[in-house]
Amino acid sequence: MAVSGLRLTIVWGLLVLILTCQADDKPEGKPDEQPHDSGKNSEPAFPKFLNILGSDIIENAVEFILRSMTRSTEFLEHGDKQGEHSSK
């Protein structure tokens, strides 16, 4: 179950990163229709939202992986201690 959740998190994170990278690209052959005004923010809010969402997904995935690794090492350490106690 944990492996499938990890895979799903990785796939979603990569998908969001790809979408945010593609959202910033302009189609080839089409020039900018709007002139650049120094006073206006030319960056749309939707790709920024996707960028933040992708960053959160990646941070959560890394936190999940690290938490899983510490749990598995704690489990192995406790398993070794139980094995020592049972042999006494």
From Swiss-Prot:
It comes from the Eukaryota. One of its GO terms (cellular component) is extracellular region. Pfam families: DUF4576. Its main location: secreted. The keyword Secreted applies. It is found in: Secreted. It comes from Bos taurus (Bovine). Keywords: Secreted, Signal. Residues 25-45 are annotated as: Disordered. Residues 1-23 form the signal peptide. This is Uncharacterized protein C5orf46 homolog. InterPro entries: DUF4576 (IPR027950). Residues 25-40 have a biased composition (Basic and acidic residues).
